[in-house]
């Protein structure tokens, strides 16, 4: 399909669609990011240990992966517009349920539902972006990933204060409000002609020869790249605040440090969206981002308190750039927006299942060693491996089918 001939939204409709994409993105991480700063309260109230508590991050991330692998039949049945809407509603309902079902079982169940909702949006929204903005795809994806990081930053910064005002369960449940608001904005914005999906029968039957991604080694190579890059994000999202609380910092301080780091991630996302068009070879920006993240992880081990602010800045800039770059790298491999959406679902499916293991492994290390330093060091090795794999994706190389 020639994307240049696809219907382009008017300026007003395009801005509204970008606003809707941004609003949806803001809701993809708060249900997880708000947990870390409140983890000691949650553990005290429910009796959870570190391994069980890690499931509040591990399960949503794993469900994102499982949901992504199932997204093609869901898209055939629901369509992109309804699928994204369902995702936002599920996130809202899961957050709201935490005000009522605040025991261990209820929190774990809500984590699963959050993961399904996030999976729907993360697999389908980029397809809409690529169709509606074919010539500005990298820029709009930068806006999208900036929204993801921004939502996490706000959730981390406000968690402790909200918990003091309405309790930890209420602080988690309040994130239902922006999720439902995003659903309303999406209902309006997704009516733009360029946001409409192609005929579902065409999707089901296929309009061009396809080779299953599981038969293409290049597609498999993208899975650990996204998985390891996302592992760094999920690891710090889950365990950075408890790491600082364990070292004697207050809950509010730990939350603000996570917020500062995610604020740096927002800045990185903005920079990627502004400048990625100048780098058709994604390897250079990726290597720079990994280097920043490695220095930040080293700082967490060596100088976590005395140099906390620069450590958060470096870590956030690195991880915040790695995340959108991995998505853009994957979407670069196929021109057709529907087929590229299928690729992203495949890559996110395996990648997020890999990423779900990092918070769980860190919880195990914390229970056994009462320290998370080893988790940061292992993550650093993972990022080095990811960077080496990225080097094989040179511009002009063979694309996927």
Feature names for model-found ranges:
Residues 110-147:
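Cytoplasmic helix-loop-helix junction between adjacent transmembrane helices
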Residues 135-136, 143-194:
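Helix-loop-helix hairpin linking two adjacent transmembrane segments in secondary transporters
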Residues 120-133, 321-335:
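Intracellular juxtamembrane helix-capping segments at the cytosolic ends
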Residues 66-105:
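Conserved MFS/SLC helix-loop-helix module at the cytosolic interface between two early adjacent transmembrane helices
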Residues 67-79, 268-281:
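Helix-to-loop junctions at the C-terminal end of transmembrane segments
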Residues 47, 79, 100-105, 134, ...:
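Helix-breaking motifs and short loop linkers at transmembrane-helix boundaries and internal kinks
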Residues 334-372, 379:
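A late C-terminal transmembrane helix in Major Facilitator Superfamily
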Residues 35-36, 217-269:
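Extracytoplasmic gate region of multi-pass secondary transporters
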